[in-house]
Amino acid sequence: MASLRKSHPLLKIANNALVDLPAPINISAWWNFGSLLGLCLIAQILTGLFLAMHYTSDISTAFSSVAHICRDVNYGWLIRNMHANGASFFFICIYLHIGRGLYYGSYLYKETWNVGVVLLLLVMMTAFVGYVLPWGQMSFWGATVITNLLSAVPYMGDTLVQWIWGGFSVDNATLTRFFAFHFLLPFIGAAATLVHLIFLHETGSNNPTGLNSDADKISFHPYFSYKDILGFTFLLTALIALALFSPNLLGDPENFTPANPLVTPPHIKPEWYFLFAYAILRSIPNKLGGVLALLASILVLMVVPLLHTSKQRSLTFRPFTQVLFWLLIADVAILTWIGGMPVEHPFIIIGQVASFLYFSLFLVLAPTAAWMENKILGW
């Protein structure tokens, strides 16, 4: 008789996804980030739930309710610091996960990849509306600047902005709806994660060689379940260390000042994980052009599978394209730095060159290098 985990209608789904799943024997620690992202999502939902029990989404009390959580609620300071820094770790894991996908050609699983890009957009949206909730100076002005970008939409832009604001400026209605969205979106993200996994399990995981590994698979449990738990301990140790020792390291000092519509901060900038996209937005001196570039900076990931010209899947044995990959990593780091700098010489031109290089690498240089490698290998 089959064991319960293999016969029960619900347990067998979990069994096929987490226990008896055939996994390639040679996947490295770079394949840990999917499960780490699942852990981040669970941690964010749990800490967020406890924060929502004490938070009030009203402009007169939002800032003081966050102070109340940190001062008066049992371990409120820890929950708040874990949630705020958990977002940073979420994005670190996302960017490493995407980088792994680009390096090893995982994007050729087109459905999995495209659902992943949608997930990235969902997480970015969630983080943006969440940053507005403490109602500090950078919360307010960040919301004002970013929502205002929608006014660049032809014909209906102004109406669209006022519709999102719920009035003629970022006000109480805006905060209330942003709280509603911030509560809802992670659950939509959890559902999209399941879709992501369903598509992944249709094909099975890729591996560092980029070759078919059907002939050499091992069960997910115990091998990769324990490997994932090791990753969990590293992630949680780092998160707790940051939350306890340096909780404000990645935040903006402006957000310790309550929101004031009459005083504009000298430098309006988003959290560090959006700076690369913000730099691309600012590098185009036209409002609509900037908004389109901002969107394209993320949506360019969707065209990567269409521009795969190489006969090999992974970059493991492709030195030319490897150089371009690391150039992309350096370029994103430069864009992140530029995004946090004021709009003045020499930062403007550096940002424009880095933005041009960012799109060139995806759309022109990488496909060309792959084509050249095919020629050199006589394929």
Swiss-Prot record:
Pfam families with a match to the protein in the record: Cytochrom_B_C, Cytochrome_B
Cofactor(s) annotated in UniProt: heme b
Domain of life the protein comes from: Eukaryota
Positions of transmembrane segments: 33-53, 77-98, 113-133, 178-198, 226-246, 288-308, 320-340, 347-367
One Gene Ontology term, aspect cellular component: mitochondrial inner membrane
Stored InterPro entries: Cyt_b/b6_C (IPR005798), Cyt_b/b6_C_sf (IPR036150), Cyt_b/b6_N (IPR005797), Cytb/b6-like_sf (IPR027387), Cytochrome_b (IPR030689), Cytochrome_b_C_euk/bac (IPR048260), Cytochrome_b_N_euk/bac (IPR048259), Di-haem_cyt_TM (IPR016174)
Subunit structure: The cytochrome bc1 complex contains 3 respiratory subunits (MT-CYB, CYC1 and UQCRFS1), 2 core proteins (UQCRC1 and UQCRC2) and probably 6 low-molecular weight proteins.
Function of the molecule: Component of the ubiquinol-cytochrome c reductase complex (complex III or cytochrome b-c1 complex) that is part of the mitochondrial respiratory chain. The b-c1 complex mediates electron transfer from ubiquinol to cytochrome c. Contributes to the generation of a proton gradient across the mitochondrial membrane that is then used for ATP synthesis.
Identification of the protein by name: Cytochrome b
Natural source organism: Poeciliopsis occidentalis (Gila topminnow)
Lineage of origin: Eukaryota, Metazoa, Chordata, Craniata, Vertebrata
Gene label: mt-cyb
